[in-house]
Amino acid sequence: MNHIKTILIDLFLLAVLGLHAQELQVKVNVNHSQIQTTDASVFENLQQTIEQFMNDRQWTDLQFQSVERIQCSLNLTVTKYVREDHHFECTALIQANRPVYNAAYTSTLYNNRDASFNFDFQQFDQLNFMEENIDNQLTALLAYYALLIIGIDLDSFAPMGGSDILQRCMFLVNNAQNLGFPGWKAFEDSRNRFAFINDYLDEGMKPFRQLQYDYYRKGLDEMANNAERGRTEISTALETHLTQAHSDKPLSLLPQIWTNYKKDELTAIYKGKGTQKEKERIYELLMGINASQNSSWEMIKQ
């Protein structure tokens, strides 16, 4: 009897684990204040449909427990809505966070703005996605950010750990170029979706990908146990990998985008901590990469 109970418990646990295989936990917000309409139901349905599509789908073969799901936010601002054509033109702010080991703190893993998040959507549409046949703009957009975020997250836990997922993201981008929407093509815009994933996978940006692992896994994750050692690892990662990535591909915007959303965290890591010599080195490094955040970098020297 006990043996049967054990088997039943094991089967139950397997079932529970299976229910938590999804990788993402995305919160969607749709701001339609610029659109004059008396019926907001299409925007509410859009928000619910996107959340369901992103959160209920299993994007990889990897097993994620409920507590391991990547926390994300997708904030859409609708700038144009053509009801007759079911056409939306939006800007999107996409953010993903990563928990820090042994700390009640999450770190921004990705944060970027998509200025051409345009698509067609009719209320109560069912979103279907086949990776081998990209035929819908909205699902292509959502799949792009799902794969990109999962790939970057895996890079932060193992050196180049997200390569397979990121290659799928690149494959999607190449196939989505036939959809006729902006953001997918090379040379169209230096900050578009193609540019980001193409740069991220470029051989010259391997130091930037190594930075993801060293900064998070060897640096931030270590700080709860030993703040001094964690900060030293972060300094080494910045001075070695971030500097090399910027030097090897000075026209790449990835180091600038990264330092834009890391400025507050970097300031907190160094302000009032470490040696003055270390602070000066990090200040000079960050100024050389992203002088537009000078006010934040100045606080590092305090």
Where are these regions (language model features)?
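Bacterial Sec-dependent N-terminal signal peptides
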Residues: 1-24
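Start-of-domain marker
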Residues: 22-89, 100-102
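A cross-kingdom marker for long, charged
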Residues: 29, 213-302
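Second-shell loop/turn segments in exported
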Residues: 33-40, 128-136, 248
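Sec-exported extracytoplasmic/periplasmic mature domains
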Residues: 51-59, 151-155, 267, 271
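Acidic/His-rich structured neighborhood in mature extracellular/periplasmic domains
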Residues: 84-198
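Flexible, glycine-rich surface segments
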Residues: 161-251
